[in-house]
Amino acid sequence: TLRDFLRKDSLRQQQEKFRIRGIREKEVLSSCGHVAGRTRFDREGALSCNPKLKYHKLNETMRACFYEGSWRREKCRSFEIFASQGDYPLKGFHYLLAAMPEILQEFPQAHISVAGISITGYGTLKEKLKISGYGKYLRDLMKVHDLEGRVSVLGNLTDRQMKEAYLNSHVFVCPSALENSPNSLGEAMLLGVPCVASRTGGIPDMAKGDKSALFFEKGNVHELAACILR
């Protein structure tokens, strides 16, 4: 898109930026003596860069408001699916959109809410000029799957607003292509929200499959739909 060209930020250019970050991260880890982490994924990754590292397990503390209150089925919005982010490909929002036709076959009332800024707006000239390649792809997916009116973008949310979004949802979905230990999944589980997450990176170390979360193989939209339908 024009925006991607002017900002030198196409999907391939974003891939290259991640590649460069990876090289720099390896350089940093190679010069360190100690590193802190919390999953097998980050431990194995760090030690593969520098086998001499001393690894320290350090679990995260969530924001205070997520330790209070709990999800209740009778108070949530039925068939509401919540995702915490979807503005770049690694977050896997396109997988959730692609899974919607199967979900809608069984539950026509299903609706997606996603936190963060809208990257699919195309109503004004400014929005048409600013849309990214990924935003256009998401927009095309919504057209192909007839999802107009079934996806709401909530904007940037405070911690309290995020908590409200979790509690209002019927299920929280983390469809990412790669994660280490996403805070969003931790927050949702603390509140007792039913969770669906991709089996990737460090996520399997955060939750017990079929107990605190349902896992699907990353990118498998049929498994994703099946987990949500459960």
Descriptions of predicted regions:
Residues 177:
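Aromatic "clamp/platform" in nucleotide-sugar-dependent glycosyltransferases that forms part
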Residues 72-91, 97-100, 112-113:
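Conserved donor-binding/catalytic core segment of Leloir-type glycosyltransferases
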Residues 209-210, 214-221, 230:
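Conserved acidic donor-binding segment of nucleotide-sugar-dependent glycosyltransferases
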Residues 2-34, 48:
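Membrane-proximal helix-turn-helix segments that form the acceptor-binding/catalytic region
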Residues 194-197:
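Short hydrophobic beta-strand element within catalytic cores of glycosyltransferases
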